[in-house]
């Protein structure tokens, strides 16, 4: 991931520079010429994950889908993300209030830009916490959830790299960022106006929005806690999920549930292992290359295209930028960038996860018909996050290196938990 630290370093530094300019007499002139100078970093993130067009939301408060609500109610799904940034108050022990405000604002603003890069809508800033909505009426539910976990993962990466480096340079302890995410389906999220004339807001009423905040509070430091519906909708591989462990009188105790009552039943929570998740991307460098002579995307990379047979065309699918529908024809290609990477043979392997693939006993299989080729064809079939793996062998049939490409598949017809009483 080293190459991508630059994006976050530039994003953070640009926000510091931007807010420093607010106190400069030359700000108005510079702002007219450079008011979008920080946007290229956001655009880099969007392009990296295949996001096209303008960002979804450029405002705070009312979700753009519900500007017209007056005295009515509307039901529509949403994926809620709540992030809390703790530790920035220590800045007040070392700096003047002006400088504390500068750094805290740069941190919050950088977080906002990361969420907006994934089409998140900033609903509310609460001190050092931010409530973000992912999803809108034109977006598939699976893509809203994918956007949320991708944004949350990069937010934690931003903290583990750029922000950690900044705080250590100031001889301060790094920040502790906790993120909670949950999903409420259409019948479980009510949008309406709260308050009185002139003092009101349009917001969501949903236990799943409330639970996002609870999950944040339950998350370990610098981790992401996801609700049961997140996994139910995407069917995330177990290797990217774990049960929170707490010590009780020296004994490890599993904390599986956020709700465990007779009237509401059980609702589970899990830690989303964002480090393992990001480290499994073909398009992102690994966190450590110490034992790797060749690795993606520096030396090689798998790319994927959707084959549109009807129109005799193809479109590139950016890794895990969105979910693919079932029964889509795909073309995978291995691109070699390092001329020193000499190999004798290539083998392709499909690794599926999830209940649907498990039921059909199609979890893993070799693509023998494509042995020796730098490409292979496959079709989407099962809901979940699956991987196409490619292995390169030397003349002695020993593995030189390998790469894997992850893709989400979802028919957006998933059953999720509906808590409480429906109208």
Swiss-Prot record:
Name under which the protein is recorded: Cytidylate cyclase
Stored PROSITE patterns: GUANYLATE_CYCLASE_2 (PS50125)
This protein's UniProt keywords: Antiviral defense, Cytoplasm, Lyase, Manganese, Metal-binding, Nucleotide-binding
Source species: Staphylococcus aureus
Amino-acid positions noted as binding a ribonucleoside 5'-triphosphate in the UniProt annotation, renumbered to this chain: 82
Cofactor entry: Mn(2+)
Keyword Transit peptide recorded: no
Known partners and oligomeric status: Homodimer.
Gene (name only): pycC
SUPFAM superfamilies: Nucleotide cyclase (SSF55073)
Domain Guanylate cyclase: 79-184
Record text about domains: Has an N-terminal nucleotide cyclase domain and a C-terminal nucleotide sensor domain (AGS-C).
